Regions:
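Short, well-structured alpha-helical segments
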Residues: 234-246, 307
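Short intracellular "coupling" helices and adjacent cytoplasmic loop segments at the cytosolic face
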Residues: 227-237, 250
């Protein structure tokens, strides 16, 4: 009897050790793949600190700066638009590897740009990799993750995006030199290093087992699933995936599939959540934070970049909090908590800018505090949730296309918000509320932040009806739920 008990205990211990090894391995895969998110964040955030020096070096106005900033986003639209089919055809891994090469070449080209037009073209090219990584990486991680920690692992993508933004701010700060207007060039060159890390790291990673099975590579998929899920669970996962493949085997993966009645709801959710993710205005802070801090009264490019670094630190910290809670509290609780905080923060920001000329030095720090809160509430909610949800809600047959549409949407909306920010600031500046700097009047962002706050309020109401609770539910069960015509808020 004693020997039997000892054997049972030993077997259980070995099982736990094996599960621990599997979990560690999955985390390593997710972290390396999520380096694509770090590059996404770096190459979108680096422009922020470069702007003051670019304007002096090339002698350009805010309109040209908006074009340079938006060029990367237009490239991202192209990347997201054309890579859905390619990802389903070639596989997730190969597409991520290709994006790493584009990231590296684009970083060098941006740093070498001799004029604004060349920089616009370089940013356009670089944007292709941003668009590709924005859907291929979360999709890859979602398909390779065990159900119980899928939310945590996919959210690592958003964590790495925020980390990339912070690294770009720190890089900007390191190279910033008020006496050297060309210091923006090495800011861009710094993006080569993480691109090489992604290229080398992903070369050693496995392909998505779900993609492999969809292409008939059953043995390879089974080997990967045994390593990341364990032998017992792998059998169940393979059975579930096979069932879905059988259901979809006579269907052709094409764009029109997304308009089928059973897929209209997940399509609407994907586009809707990405619309609200962008139109609460978060990327105006990511791209233009030094300019916004100038408006708040900060003096000098370096001091404004320091304040931007603070934004980056808050962004990363809050995303870490989100990752911890996303598979504990669930998607909906985080969504509603975050959106409520975003609304209150934007109202406070709008009020502080409306009184910026009267508040003076105190107003600067009120702006900083509520800017930090705004970023924090975004980072614990709709920031990571947008990317997570679009990677979960589509069936295997069209998951690449669905994630591509979600990613395409975010870049279109991002481009609109980024290209119109200064125009919106000027259009919504009430006469008499202009910001006075060195005796000159400039637009006041109070109205713009108020507008974004209104959008956030609409997002809160929309989320009650359309944000699904996917915590702890397998991708195959989510697919079956849509097939039965379920309503998003009833998914549990």
């Amino acid at each position: 009897m004693e020997k039997i008990c000892t054997l049972i205990i030993h077997t259980e211990i070995m099982k736990q050790v094996s599960q621990h090894k599997n979990t560690v391995q999955v985390y390593i895969i997710a972290i390396i793949a999520a380096t694509g998110g770090l590059l996404f964040g770096f190459d979108t955030g680096v422009i922020s600190g470069a702007i003051p020096f670019l304007q002096k070096d090339f002698g350009i106005n805010d309109g040209i700066i908006e074009l340079i900033t938006t060029a990367g986003l237009v490239g991202a639209i192209a990347g997201a638009l054309f890579c859905g089919k390619i990802t389903d055809y070639l596989g997730r891994k190969k597409v991520i590897l290709a994006s790493a090469v584009i990231f590296a070449v684009g970083a060098v080209w941006s740093g070498l740009a001799p004029n604004p037009l060349n920089l616009i073209l370089a940013r356009l090219f670089l944007g292709i990799a941003i668009g590709v990584s924005s859907f291929a990486v979360p999709l890859y991680i979602a398909e390779i993750s065990p159900t119980n920690i899928r939310g945590t692992l996919v959210s690592m993508f958003q964590l790495m995006v925020t980390l990339g933004v912070l690294v770009s701010y720190l890089s900007d700060l390191f190279f910033a030199d008020e006496t050297n207007i060309s210091c923006w060039r090495p800011m861009f060159y710094a993006g080569v290093l993480p691109a090489l890390i992604l290229l080398i790291g992903m070369f050693c990673m496995p392909e998505s087992p779900r993609w492999l099975m969809s292409k008939g590579f059953m043995q390879e998929a089974m080997l990967i699933l045994r390593k990341i899920e364990g032998a017992e669970t792998a059998e169940k996962v393979v059975h579930a995936i096979n069932e879905e493949i059988e259901k979809n085997k006579n269907e052709i993966s094409k764009w029109s599939e997304l308009l089928k009645p059973t897929l209209r709801t997940p399509l609407f959710i994907a586009v809707g959540i990405m619309f609200f993710q962008q139109f609460v205005g978060i990327n105006t802070v990511i791209y233009y934070s030094p300019k916004i801090f100038f408006m708040a009264g900060f003096d000098g490019a370096v001091s404004a970049i320091w304040a931007a670094v603070g934004v980056g630190v808050v962004n990363v910290t809050a995303t870490l909090v989100s990752i911890y809670f996303i598979d504990k509290l669930g998607r909906r609780k985080l969504y509603f908590t975050g959106l409520t905080g975003i609304i209150l923060s934007l109202v406070a920001l709008s009020a502080s800018f409306a009184l910026v000329n009267e508040l003076g030095y105190i107003g600067q720090w009120i702006t900083v505090i509520f800017m930090f809160l705004y970023v924090a509430f975004f980072a614990i909610s709709i920031g990571p949730l947008g990317w997570l949800i679009i990677s979960e809600i589509f069936p295997q047959k069209v998951r690449g296309l669905g994630a591509s549409v979600g990613s395409l949407s975010v870049w279109i909306f991002n481009s609109i918000v980024s290209f119109t920010f200064f125009k919106l600031v000027n259009a919504l500046t009430i006469s008499g509320s202009e910001i006075i700097t060195d005796g000159e009047k400039a637009g006041n962002p109070a109205g713009a932040f108020g507008f974004y706050g209104l959008i956030a309020l609409i997002a809160l109401v929309w989320g009650y009806f359309y944000v699904p609770e996917t915590k702890g539910i397998s991708l195959e069960k989510i697919e079956d739920f849509w097939r039965k015509g379920g309503k998003p808020r009833k998914l549990k």
